[in-house]
Design a protein with these regions (language model features):
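A short, active-site helix/loop in glycosyltransferases that binds the activated sugar's phosphate group
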Residues: 160-162, 181, 197-232
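Nucleotide-activated donor-binding/catalytic signature segment of Leloir-type glycosyltransferases, i.e.
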Residues: 297-317, 332
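Short hydrophobic beta-strand element within catalytic cores of glycosyltransferases
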Residues: 355-362
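Conserved donor-binding/catalytic core segment of Leloir-type glycosyltransferases
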Residues: 203, 237-265, 271-276, 288
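Active-site proximal beta-strand in glycosyltransferases
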Residues: 30, 150-153, 157-159, 163-182, ...
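Acidic anion/phosphate-binding donor-loop and adjacent secondary structure
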Residues: 182-185, 228-243, 250, 325
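Membrane-proximal helix-turn-helix segments that form the acceptor-binding/catalytic region
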Residues: 132-146, 179-202
Length: 432
C-alpha cells in the first residue's frame, strides 16, 4: 500500500507517515512551498542547539548530531509561474485567532450561512472561475500523485486531491481547518467544502469541529487523535530540572509552552493565577513561558505590572527534543483556558507523565473517547489558582495524576491506535 501525505502543517503528516511505516505502509510526505521550521523533520526529531530561521531554516548550517531527514520526506516547489497564479491555500495556524479577536466576523459568517441555507438548502457551490484559479498547478500535482494508491491531504490540500488525483481515493485530514475556511465566501472556502464532501473519509482531530462537519452536511467523518508518539514523549530523567531548582531556588516548576494569544489561550488568566500562588500561598514557584505568539509584549507588560519578572523564565520556541526535556523538568504543565479542547501540548505532556491543567469540555469529547482523560480542568483565574495549589500541596496526588495521564495516553491516544485507525480507513476505501 502506497500512500502520499500531502501538506505538513505542524509536522502532522510527518508524524503520521512515521507511524504508518512502522506498520509496513509505504507512506511518503510531500511538503511543497512551505518551509516553516515547525513543519520540518529536523524540528521534530533532531537534537540541536540554536534557533534556525522560522520561515526558511538553513539546516546545512546547523549541527544536527547525525540526524538526516528520511528520503520519504519530499520537499518540493511549484514552478514560480504557477506559484504566482495559485493562491497559497493555508496561511498558517492563526486563522482562528482572527475570529476570536473579531466576534463580529463570527456573527457575519453565521448569519450569512444561515440565510443561504434557508434560501437554497445548501452551502454556496463553487464557481467555474474557482477551478480556473488553480488549474495551472494541475500537471505538477498529477505528476506528484503518480504511483500512489491513496492520497491523504491535510489542511486545505483536499482541494488539490479532489481536482488532480486521477482515480485514487483521498482522505481529508482536518486539524483546525474546518472551523472557519469552508464557511468563507471565497474560492478556497467553496472548493474546500466540496472537497470535504467528495472525500472518501474526513479525519477530524479537533472534537469541537463536529459542529462544523454537521453544518456542512458531512456524514463521511470520524475522529482520530493528534499524532503523538508516546515512545518518544515519555518520563525520563533530565539535568534541566536540577539546573532550574539550583538557579532559582524553587520548589515548584510550572511550564506553559503555548503561544501568547489571550483570547485563544487565556495567558493573562494563567499569569494572574501564578501571581496569586506566589503572594497568597507563598510558593517558591517559577513559571516558564514560551516567547512566541502575537501578544508576547502584552504578557510581558502584565508580568511587569505584577512584579513577577524574577520568577518568570522565557524560552524561545523549543524544538521537540528540548520540549521533552522541559516537560520532564516541570511539576505541572499548563495549556489553554478558553477553547475547551486540546492540541498537542496536552497529550505530549501527559505522555511524559505530567499533570496538565487546561480548560477541558467533557461534553465536546464524549463522541471521541470512551474514557475521559485525567486532566485538571480550569477555566477561570480562580480555578487555575486552585489547581496550582492542589498539585503544589499534595505531590503524591500530582504524581498519581501524572501516572494516570500517561496510562490514558497509551490506551486512548497512542501512536499505534492512530496508525491502525488510518490503515483501517485506507483498506476500506481501497476495497470499494
Amino acid at each position: 500500500m502506497r500512500v502520499l501525505h500531502l501538506g505538513n502543517i505542524a509536522n502532522n503528516a510527518y508524524s503520521n507517515a512515521k507511524f504508518l511505516r512502522r506498520k509496513g505502509v509505504e507512506a511518503d510526505v510531500l511538503c511543497y512551498d512551505y518551509a516553516h521550521v515547525m513543519a520540518q523533520p529536523e524540528w521534530e526529531d533532531a537534537e540541536f542547539e540554536g534557533h534556525p530561521d522560522e520561515v526558511n531554516p538553513r539546516w546545512e548550517q546547523v549541527d544536527l548530531n547525525g540526524f538526516r531527514r528520511p528520503a520519504w520526506f519530499i520537499q518540493e516547489e511549484l514552478a514560480p509561474r504557477v506559484r504566482g497564479r495559485c493562491k497559497q491555500w493555508f496561511k498558517g495556524q492563526f486563522r482562528l485567532e482572527r475570529l476570536v479577536r473579531d466576534p463580529v466576523r463570527w456573527l457575519h459568517v453565521f448569519i450569512k450561512y444561515r440565510l443561504e441555507n434557508l434560501l437554497s438548502g445548501t452551502e454556496p457551490r463553487p464557481h467555474a472561475v474557482d477551478f480556473f484559479k488553480i488549474y495551472p498547478a494541475r500537471k505538477w500535482f498529477q505528476q506528484w500523485f503518480k504511483g500512489y494508491d491513496l492520497i491523504q491531504a491535510y489542511a486545505t490540500e483536499p482541494i488539490h486531491a479532489m481536482l488532480f488525483a486521477t482515480g485514487q481515493p483521498y482522505v481529508a485530514f482536518e486539524h483546525g481547518t474546518m472551523r472557519e475556511i469552508p464557511f468563507e465566501d471565497s474560492t478556497t472556502g467553496r472548493l474546500l467544502t466540496l472537497a470535504y464532501r467528495q472525500a472518501g473519509r474526513v479525519l477530524i482531530t479537533n472534537p469541537d469541529v463536529i459542529t462544523s462537519a454537521q453544518r456542512l452536511g458531512l456524514t463521511n467523518f470520524q475522529f482520530i487523535p493528534h499524532p503523538v508518539d508516546e515512545t518518544k514523549y515519555r518520563p525520563r530523567p533530565t539535568l534541566l530540572r536540577d539546573q532550574l531548582v539550583n538557579r532559582y531556588q524553587t520548589d515548584l516548576i510550572l511550564f506553559a509552552p503555548s503561544r501568547h494569544n489571550w483570547a485563544l489561550k487565556g495567558n493573562d488568566l494563567l499569569i494572574r493565577a501564578f501571581a496569586r500562588l506566589r503572594k497568597e500561598v507563598g510558593r517558591r514557584a517559577i513559571l516558564i513561558l514560551s516567547d512566541w505568539g502575537q501578544e508576547v509584549d502584552r504578557s510581558r507588560a502584565l508580568i511587569g505590572a505584577l512584579e513577577l519578572e524574577p520568577v518568570v523564565i522565557w524560552t524561545p520556541p523549543l524544538n521537540k527534543t528540548k520540549l521533552i526535556d522541559y516537560y520532564n523538568a516541570a511539576d505541572v504543565v499548563l495549556d489553554q483556558f478558553t477553547l475547551g479542547v486540546f492540541g498537542t501540548v496536552t497529550p505530549e505532556a501527559m505522555a511524559c507523565g505530567k499533570p496538565v491543567v487546561l480548560n477541558f469540555n467533557r461534553q465536546v469529547h464524549e463522541w471521541c473517547f470512551p474514557e475521559m482523560p485525567p486532566v485538571l480542568g480550569a477555566r477561570t483565574e480562580h480555578e487555575i489558582f486552585e489547581r496550582m495549589v492542589e498539585v503544589s500541596e499534595d505531590r503524591g496526588y500530582a504524581a498519581a495524576v501524572g501516572q494516570a495521564s500517561r496510562e490514558w495516553i497509551v490506551k486512548h491516544h497512542g501512536w499505534e491506535l492512530v496508525a491502525d485507525r488510518q490503515i483501517s480507513v485506507y483498506r476500506e476505501l481501497l476495497q470499494r
